Swiss-Prot record:
Domain TFIIS N-terminal: start-end pairs: 294-374
Top-level lineage group: Eukaryota
Chain residue ranges for the region called Disordered: 1-200, 382-454
Family: Belongs to the IWS1 family.
Protein's UniProt name: IWS1-like protein
Keywords: Nucleus
Natural source organism: Caenorhabditis elegans
UniProt xrefs under Pfam families: Med26 (PF08711)
InterPro entries registered for this protein in UniProt: RNAPII_TF_IWS1, TFIIS/LEDGF_dom_sf, TFIIS_N
Compositional bias ranges of the Acidic residues kind: 94-103, 166-179
Subcellular location per the Swiss-Prot or TrEMBL entry: Nucleus
Annotated GO CC locations: nucleus
Biased composition (Basic and acidic residues): 134-143, 383-395, 414-425
Amino acid sequence: MSDHEEESHGASPTSPASSGASSPLAPISPRSEGNAPESPSGDVQDIYKDESFEAPASPARDSSAPASPSAASPAGSRSPSPSPVKTKSKVMIDSDEDSDAEESANKRALIDSDASDAEGKKRRVMLDSDDSDHEGTSKKEPTTKNLFGDDSDDDDEDRPKKTNDLDEFVEGRDEEESQETSKPAYDSDDDDGPVDRHGRHFEWDFDKMLAEKKAERKKKTRRGGKDGGIDIINDDDGTVSRLVERMKHAAKSDRNANIERKPAFQKIKMLPEVKAIMLRAGIVEVLIENGFMSALSEWLAPLPDKCLPALDIRITVLKLLHNPRFWKLDRSTLKQSGLGKAVMMLYKHPNETKENKGIANKLIGEWARPIYHLDTDYSTVSRQEREERDYSRMPEKRKKKINSRDEEEPNDDDQPKRPRIRDADEMGPTKSDDLKPGDKGYIPRARVPKPSTKDYVIRPEWRVTGAFKGEKKSTGNNRYDQTFRDFQERTKKSKANRIVKVSLEGRNMGI
């Protein structure tokens, strides 16, 4: 390497005189080809090896060696470089620590390598790849002060050009972050609802239904129960109260129509709805509390012209009331609502049907059992209690006969007499039973049947063996079978007529 090249590579510009600061470091001798740089101090050598390097000469030169670190000249002196070269020392200082470490390691590898001129050109291309073509001739070498952050006026002018790539990188990062924040987070757990790909919020039908149910639960109020507890008003209270108002309005409309001699059909129209609400399970208490029984008594009450309501209404209501769920209506409810009085009126009304009278009688008997403290479970009733009950329902004539027989029998034990039902064999023959069928002088005649006054409380045992297969289909001849048999008979007759009759005279012979 020539002396001119050594001088050109060894000289490094100092900071401008305007800065007024001098570098405390001693200049470093230029590095010759194949020799390590010599410095008076080992610390200074380490600093330059880690933090800065001098870029190779401009591409116009044919042969050049790797650049040696520039040494700071004494204060007040500045030696210009024949070919200014752009470096990245300021970009390295302003960048992050991670990028500084990576770039400094790459630069040390380029400085310390002993490569040929061709390799030097490749390194120049790698170092100058971030610069434009027109910036190659206006580059400056860094000084010692620039390495430690002392900026001159010239450096301030060149800062936008040197940090162009870094600014673009930072702006790109900002744009990516803004795009990420603007995108909807589909996988986020904090989303209130589902979001479609266009960013529009929508709500499923199932979510709407759950929201409505939740709103209904919030509207529920609490009240004091009969037993002192707290009962929650269910959803049926509003429905039943509105139904009761409509039932009363329908009954009033029918009464007005009856007065005006017009057809009354408002209650008939509401009958299916009333039937549906009475068939629901667990709704008896709600019906009682909302005055349903009083509205029902208005439906069963006679019209102003003393005629009974429609037959369909009477049959449906009585059958629904004869359900065990309505047997436990207390006395106060029946008296306050007037339902007991309405059912008793139907039982005693002469125009009421026999079936409805029977249902009304049973219903009144069930409602009267708690009043007389009677048990509804017949399995717990003893034999003596059943006999006493049968005796109480026995006709007066038969009671007299039983009492007359008991008086004739001596009572040795001096026990209190009690009514006892005897069998037919124990009772002596009467005038009507002197002669039996088959006896001499017995006159067969018709007898008026009398209803039995006994209560059959013991269910007979089932003695039928085998499963019931249901009613068998009739095996009678249908129309198809009869037609088929007629056809077969006609064909038989036709076949018999086809038989050739032999003639003695030889007639009708196909010879």
